[in-house]
């Protein structure tokens, strides 16, 4: 029987309209594919890939592909279902204080580490402190923008304190927990992880391969797949080549590469919606965008259906807010702006923008001076999809009377321009 390989397609939800003013940090959120792919036999083996790790400590790790593998070895403090609601993991139950600034949590007393010791509150406190001292670009470091501390209140209970009373504080608690006794007393823990998840490390070959096996100490159900082999790769191109040559069984990819793997006799595609999103943002420091009618005109000029098809090959979910459409927080009943150039033109006209000299470009007298309707669109040139969006937006805005400059820059310059406010619109 031919082994059927799968690739997991990240569906981004795309093209909300937002504003860029004061910078706010956001916890990076991740989702994982949970769709069942047939039923594996007990002796089945799966081959995955990840980058060559600097460390296998999940709280110090800086690489997302490594994090995906480490999720098999370490349980998070809290898990989250497909709709974004918190579910038990290391924490069994929890309750917020009246002011929302602290969270009391009871831990699952049945969880044991793979060295045989029991998980306790000391491990949670140690994990938070480890994360506090982690590199700034560690995968879970942004958790500390929300969490201010963690204290032990019992053998299996802790209190998490937050910097502010914020509705999404609980979302920050998806970071993994590590055993204090092991990681505080060993010198070679970077390549010998001890976790509490469904798998444990069986062997490790530096810069080559890691083997995982189903963990005998895992408190939950025994995994259907008993062995996982993890190939270490240099980059995304290597991942793709390994999958195409049958060296790995799973490839996580995005909409841009989906068409390559449409032959379901060789591979099966299983889609999941990530929390990544592309958007068009206004720089509200600019006087132009203080006029709601002009902002509405831009919204009506965005051909979202066309972009969904041409840029994302229809592998995207559109949203009108920066919230995953599958989330329990997503609100359906909000104002929407379907593509309507005629409506866009009407809003500009009602705001006083006219084409007096019939050159196709709109002007307006402001403080006694005739000014043209101009906008600069900022986009980072490394992201081909966003460049396509920016180019199409330029075309559409030009058609309704804007003079548009497309500012395609490298990522470092892009970041600097965002910080300094040197843009009118941004595709991000």
Predicted regions and their residues:
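Gly/Pro-rich hinge or "lid" segments in bacterial periplasmic/extracellular proteins
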Residues: 81-82, 173-227, 232-237, 341-346
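Periplasmic binding protein-like
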Residues: 47-48, 398-428
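Append "and occasionally in soluble cytosolic enzymes with long acidic Gly/Pro-rich linkers
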Residues: 290-395
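Extracellular/periplasmic solute-recognition and catalytic clefts
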Residues: 50, 151, 202-211, 229-286, ...
């Amino acid at each position: 029987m031919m082994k059927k390989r799968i690739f997991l397609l990240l569906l981004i939800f795309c093209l909300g309209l937002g504003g860029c003013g004061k910078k706010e940090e956001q916890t990076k959120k991740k989702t994982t594919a949970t769709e069942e792919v047939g039923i594996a036999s007990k002796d089945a083996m799966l081959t995955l890939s990840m980058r060559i790790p600097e460390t296998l400590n999940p709280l110090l790790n800086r690489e997302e592909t490594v994090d995906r593998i480490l999720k098999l070895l370490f349980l998070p403090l809290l898990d989250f279902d497909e709709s974004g609601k918190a579910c038990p993991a290391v924490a069994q139950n929890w309750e917020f204080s009246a002011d929302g600034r602290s969270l009391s949590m009871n831990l699952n007393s049945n969880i044991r580490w793979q060295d045989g010791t029991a998980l306790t509150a000391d491990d949670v406190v140690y994990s938070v402190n480890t994360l506090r001292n982690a590199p700034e670009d560690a995968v879970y470091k942004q958790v500390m923008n929300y969490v201010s501390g963690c204290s032990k209140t019992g053998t299996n209970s802790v209190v998490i304190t937050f910097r502010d009373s914020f509705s999404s504080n609980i979302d920050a608690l998806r970071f993994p927990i590590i055993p204090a006794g092991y990681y505080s007393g060993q010198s070679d823990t970077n390549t010998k992880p001890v976790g509490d998840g469904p798998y444990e490390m069986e062997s490790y070959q530096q810069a080559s391969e890691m083997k995982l096996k189903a963990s005998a100490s895992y408190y939950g159900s025994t995994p259907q797949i008993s062995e996982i082999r993890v190939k270490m790769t240099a980059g995304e191109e290597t991942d793709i080549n390994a999958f195409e040559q049958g060296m790995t069984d799973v490839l996580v990819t995005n909409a841009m590469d989906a068409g390559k793997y449409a032959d379901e006799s060789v591979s099966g595609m299983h889609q999941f919606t990530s929390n990544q999103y592309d958007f068009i943002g206004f720089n509200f420091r600019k006087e132009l965008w203080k006029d709601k009618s002009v902002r509405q005109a831009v919204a009506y000029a965005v051909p979202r259906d066309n972009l969904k098809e041409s840029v994302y090959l229809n592998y995207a979910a559109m949203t009108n807010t920066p919230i995953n459409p599958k989330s329990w927080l997503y609100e359906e009943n909000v104002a929407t702006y379907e593509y309507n150039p005629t409506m866009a033109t009407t809003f500009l006209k009602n705001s006083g923008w006219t084409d007096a000299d019939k050159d196709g470009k709109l002007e307006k007298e402001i403080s006694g001076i005739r000014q043209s309707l101009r906008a600069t669109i900022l986009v980072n040139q490394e992201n081909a999809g966003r460049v396509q969006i920016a180019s199409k937006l330029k075309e559409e805005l030009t058609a309704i009377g804007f003079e548009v400059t497309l500012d395609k820059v490298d990522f470092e310059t892009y970041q600097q321009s965002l910080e300094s406010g040197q843009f009118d619109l941004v595709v991000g």
